C-alpha cells in the first residue's frame, strides 16, 4: 500500500512553465530582465547576468566587484531555505541552487580562492534533477549549459594545462554532443572557451583525444570553432574529407514518412556545414562543386528542413562567388535567395505550430543579414523575393526581437549623443557578433538614404551595434597593444557614427566623438583625423583645421617611408593633400594654393608606382581605380584654375588631362568641369548640354544641379541680391568669375525652365543627402519660391544660411576611404 505521507509534487501549470521558459530563454541569449514568476529565480538570474557582465569578453571582475557580488550570493544562499514560493516546485529550487553555486564558484575562482571554488563546483555538480515531469526542453538546455560552465571552471581551477585538457576531453561529449542552437548563447560561449584551451592541429587529433570518430559532426563543429578563433593560422583544406563524410551520411538516409521527422544525423551534419560554408565565404575559399549534388540530395531526403535550407543558402552563395561563368553566377545566387525564402517560410511555419516560439531566433537574424549583404535590388524575384520589403521586414523583426527579450535598445533621439547615453551590453560572443552584424547590415544598406539619415535611424543602428562590443583598448600603452579584429570593427563603427553625425551637421558632437572615442586610443587612424579636420574647417578660423592636416600629412609620410601605409590610406593621403590645398586657398589665396599643386602629382606618382600593380585598385568598380583618383586630382586642379583670372586655358588643359587618363570609362566629373568652364567662357548652350548629360545619368548630382541653376538664376541681380549671393557663396570647387545666362524664347520657355529646376531641386532634397545639406540648393529654391510668391522661400533661405555656416571646406565623402 502506498505511503500516504509521501508528498507528490504537483503538476506545474502551463502558464508558469511558459514564463519560466521565457526567462531562461532570455538568459541563454544574455538577457538581463526577467519575470519568471519566482522572485528567487529572477534574483539569481540577475546575479548571474551581473557576474557574466564582468566575465564574458574580459579578464574577470575587479576585486571590489567580486566582493559585492560574493556578498549578495552568500545572502541568497542563506535565504534559500526560507523561500516558500519554491516549496511546491523542487525543479525550480534545484535550478536556483545550481545557478547560485556556479556563481559562487566563479567568484571564488576570480578571487584566487581555488579550494572554495572547487567545493562550490562539486556541490553544483551533485544537484540532480529527478522530477522529470516538471522539466521542460528549455530547462534541459539551461541545465546543460550550467554543467558545461561548471566543467570549464573545474578545468581552470586545476591550474594545470594537462589536467585541464584531460578533464575537458573526458567529460565534454558526455554532456553535449550536438551543435547547440545559436540562440543558446551561454552554452556556445563556454564551448568556445573550452575549445580555446585545447591544443590540436588536425581533426584526427581532436577526435582521438575525445575518443570518438572523426566523422562526428560535433567534432567537426569544434574544429570549425578553432578555425574561427585562429584567423591568421594557415588554412588546412579538408573540403574533400567533409564531402566524403556528408556522402556517407546521405547513404543511410531516406525520406521521412508522415509519422517520422527528418533524419537527425543529416540535420546535424547540415548544421556543421553552415559554420563551414560561412567560414569559406568569409575567407573566400572555393569549395568542391560536388557539394551541389550533396545539397540537392539533402533536400530530396528531407521535408521542409530549416537546417538544409540555410546550409543551401550559404553553399549556393559560395558557388556563385567562385564561378567564372556569369550565367552560373546568377543562377547560383538566385538559388541562394530561393533557399533563404524557404528558410523563412519554414521558420514561420514552425513559429505558428509551436505557440509563437522561434526555432532559433539568432540563426534567423543571421540568415537575414547574410542574404541582404550578398544581394541587392537587382536580385529581386517577382512575387517571391522583394529586396526592399525584405530589408523592412528585417528591421521590424530585429526591433521585435529586442522588445520580446527586453534587451536594451538605443532610440533615435538618444543616439544623437553616444557619449551621454551609451550603455555597454555584454552578451555571449556569438550573440554579439550576429546582432552587431545585423545592425551594421541595416546601416550599410540604408546609409545613402536621406530619410533614414534625417530620422536618426542611421545613428541608432550604429549605436546599437557599438553597444554590443566587448573588446576595447585601455587608454594605457595604446601604441604597444596590437589591435584585434573586434577592436578594429568597433573603431570602424565609431568612425561611421562620427561621420553620420557630421553628415547631419551635428558638427560639435561629431568633433567630441572623434576626439573621445577614436583619436585618443587610435592616434594613427588617418581618416578620423581627416574627418576631424573637415569638421574643424566649418569654423571661421581655419588655422586649427590646417594644423591638423599638416600634422597628419607628416605622420602619413613617415608611414610611407616605413612602408606601412595601406592602400586605402594612400587614397586618404591624396585627398588629405587636396584638403590642405583647399585650406591654403581659403587662408592664403588661390595663387598660393596653385604653387603647392605640383606636390599632389608628385605624391600620386610616389604612392601609386606602375611597378606595384597591387596598388592599382581598391575594388572592382572603376571609381576604385587609381586612374579615377588621378582624374579627381586633375578636376580639382581645373576648378582651382577657374577661380583665378585669365587661367581658362589651364583649366581646359587640366580637364583634357583628366579625360585622357582613361578612355574606356567616361567620367561625368569631366562633363561637370566643362560645364562650369563654359559658364566662365559665356557659352551657356555648351554648359547646359554638359549639365543635362550628367543629370540624364544622375538626376540628383549636386554639382550639375547647381550648374543648371546658375544658368537660369538670376538673370539680373540687384545690389542686395548680389550681397546675399556673396554671403551664401558657391563651394570652393565652383566659383566662376563671369556669369553666363540662358536666352529664353519667350515667357513660356522661361516658366518651363523655372518649373523644371523647381522639380529637380525639390526631388533632390527629398532623395539626396548632399543636396539636402547643400546651401546652394536651398538658395536657388528660395529664389524660385520667391518668384512663385511661395512663403516657403523664408524657410529655404534660413536653411541656406544654416547649412552655409556648417559647410566644411570639402565634401565629407573625401575622407571616407
Swiss-Prot record:
Keywords: Cell membrane, Endocytosis, Membrane. Its main location: cytoplasm. It is found in: Cytoplasmic granule; Cell membrane. One of its GO terms (biological process) is endocytosis. GO terms for cellular component: plasma membrane. It is a peripheral membrane protein. Belongs to the YPP1 family. Interacts with STT4 and ribosomes. Involved in endocytosis. This is Cargo-transport protein YPP1. The lineage of its organism: Eukaryota, Fungi, Dikarya, Ascomycota, Saccharomycotina.
